[in-house]
Structures are given as structure tokens and as C-alpha cells.
Design a protein with these regions (language model features):
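Alpha/beta catalytic cores of nucleotide-metabolism and tRNA/nucleoside-modifying enzymes
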Residues: 2-20, 24-146
Length: 146
């Protein structure tokens, strides 16, 4: 657990900008950190895992109070695909297939059959297999919503 009191104490005792960090998982917590500590900015780490939309949500909320919209399962699956493609560009399919495994549960948190999906993706060795599993899952979710 992050101790925001330490951030506040540092801010009160230095004349340089202070960036707060720790346990920020929503735009509301980013605002709370700014208000409670007086820090000049907020840095987000683990809160972004599986939730890259959090940056946009924080900017919008802090700028004009815009409340975050729920991210749809389609957006989450599209982002997993994009994330995987970027990993492939940065390394190769085999390395990307191994790396994406550590991110899947974060993206799928709170979604039906998330553990089963992670297990399936952990068996994949290339893009074709991963995209096929994601297509299957998206089709499954469409059936639940109709």
C-alpha cells in the first residue's frame, strides 16, 4: 500500500515539483492523490496494466470532470490484439506470444471465463493461434450480450 502521507511531507519540504505515485487505479484516485498530497503530477504504474484507457480517463476527468465510460469487451479485445501486434513488431511472434501471457488476465479482469481464456492463450505459440482464440472469445461474448 502506498503511503501518500510521505508524498505530502516531501511536497511540503521541497521547492521542486513532486510527482506522486502509488495505488492509482482510477481517475478518482488520481484526483484524490493530487488533493490530499498537493503533488504537482501523478504517475501511474500497475494501474495501467490491462487498462491503458486510464491515462485518457485521468486527463479528461482532471481537465473538465468528464466521467469515465465503461470500456467494452470489444475495445478490450481490440487492445489485446494491438498490444500483441506491437510486441511482434518489437520482437518476434514467439517472444510476443510469451510476453502477452502476462498481460491477458489484466485485460480480461472481470470478464466471463477470463481464467479459461488465459489458459488457452498460454498454449499459443504464434499470432494465428492467438488471434483465433481472441476471435472465438469475442464470438462467445457476443452470444452472451444478445
Amino acid at each position: 500500500h502506498a503511503d501518500w502521507n510521505i508524498i505530502k511531507q516531501v511536497k511540503e519540504n521541497v521547492s521542486i515539483p513532486v510527482i506522486g505515485n502509488g495505488d492509482v487505479t482510477s481517475c478518482f484516485l488520481a484526483k484524490k492523490m493530487l488533493d490530499e498530497t498537493g503533488c504537482d503530477a501523478v504517475m501511474i504504474g500497475r494501474g495501467l496494466l490491462g487498462n491503458p484507457w486510464l491515462v485518457r480517463e485521468c486527463v479528461d476527468y482532471l481537465r473538465d470532470g468528464t466521467l469515465p465510460k465503461e470500456v467494452s469487451y470489444k475495445e478490450k479485445i481490440a487492445m489485446m490484439r494491438r498490444h500483441y501486434k506491437l510486441l511482434c513488431e518489437d520482437t518476434n511472434e514467439v517472444s510476443a506470444s510469451l510476453e502477452i501471457r502476462s498481460h491477458v488476465l489484466y485485460y480480461l479482469k472481470g470478464m466471463p471465463k477470463s481464467k479459461e481464456m488465459k489458459n488457452k492463450i498460454c498454449q499459443c505459440k504464434n499470432a494465428q493461434e492467438i488471434f483465433s482464440i481472441l476471435d472465438e472469445y469475442e464470438h462467445y461474448l457476443e452470444g452472451l450480450i444478445v
